[in-house]
A protein has these predicted regions:
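Glycine-enriched alpha-helix->loop->beta-strand junction motifs that scaffold or abut catalytic
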Residues: 20-24, 80-84, 100-109, 124-131, ...
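Histidine/lysine/aspartate-rich catalytic loop segments that bind and position anionic ligands
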Residues: 112-147, 154
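Alpha-helix-loop-beta-strand connector modules within alpha/beta enzyme cores
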Residues: 44-58, 95-108, 144-164, 207-217
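Catalytic cores of alpha/beta
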Residues: 11-19, 69-73, 97, 115-125, ...
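Glycine-rich phosphate-binding active-site loops on the catalytic face of alpha/beta enzymes
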Residues: 29-33, 112, 128-140, 183-202
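Active-site beta->alpha loop and helix N-cap motifs at the rims of alpha/beta catalytic domains
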Residues: 3-5, 9-13, 19-21, 27-100, ...
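C-terminal alpha-helical cap/extension of soluble enzyme domains
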Residues: 155-217
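Conserved, mostly hydrophobic/aromatic
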Residues: 28, 86, 122, 178, ...
Length: 217
């Protein structure tokens, strides 16, 4: 399983990178705004800065929702750096654009996926990644993890190469359940990733070891 961090915060990206387990980054306009990154030039420069920290894929999202606009923005993003993956919304023109990008050799991440049917269309169009939002489905009393299972079954049935990138991951149990189901990638906040480090028995065991070590002189 690949680990992506879902943030535009450079210090958090660096911290995750320093752990040695980071495979990539996902961003979106909301995360950019949260970091106070505004204006086209600043946003593009920020994407480039992220690419200098990590060695893996960096998903950069288009703002446009029409085919021509998505293509224009996507081509500009893809030209920034070889690590950039163009993040495209699951809409009609988005699917058309994903097929266009696929034919041009530009990698894509189909975002805002909430059904297996949407994931199937994204794979047919040649998306590199598909991003089902499990946390948002859970918020609606739906089962986000079941969606991952459905997509995994469909993709395995037809040997689709599109990778399942579980998004809207809220906590460590989401990560673990996605790993059991067979998601190819999870993207999560730093707190969820570092949360995997923690267990009360680890803390108490370490405290005991350190106490015993002091007795040794």
């Amino acid at each position: 399983m690949k680990f992506f961090i879902d943030t535009a915060n450079l210090s958090q990206i660096q911290e995750a990178q320093d752990l040695g387990v980071l495979d990539g980054v996902t961003t979106n306009p909301s995360l950019m705004a949260k970091e106070g990154i505004t204006g086209k030039e600043a946003i593009l420069k920020h994407y480039t800065n992220i690419c200098t920290i990590v060695e893996g894929d960096v998903s950069a999202e288009v703002i446009a929702t029409d085919f021509e606009g998505i293509v224009r923005e996507g081509e500009e993003l893809a030209a920034l750096h070889p690590q950039i993956v163009v993040k495209v919304p699951m809409i009609k023109d988005g699917i058309k654009a994903i097929k266009y990008f696929t034919d041009k050799g530009i990698r894509t991440n189909c975002t805002l996926v909430f059904s297996a049917g949407q994931a199937l269309l994204a794979a047919k169009a040649g998306a590199t990644y598909v991003s089902p939002f499990i946390g948002r489905l859970d918020d609606m009393s739906a089962d986000g993890l079941s969606l991952i299972e459905e997509i995994r079954l469909i993709y395995d049935n037809y040997n689709f190469e599109t990778q399942i990138l579980a998004a809207s991951v809220r906590h460590t149990m989401h990560i673990l359940e996605c790993a059991k189901i067979g998601a190819d990638v999870i993207t999560a906040p730093l707190s969820a990733i570092t949360g995997l480090l923690k267990h009360p028995l680890t803390d108490s065991g370490l405290a005991q070891f350190l106490a015993d070590a002091k007795k040794l002189g």
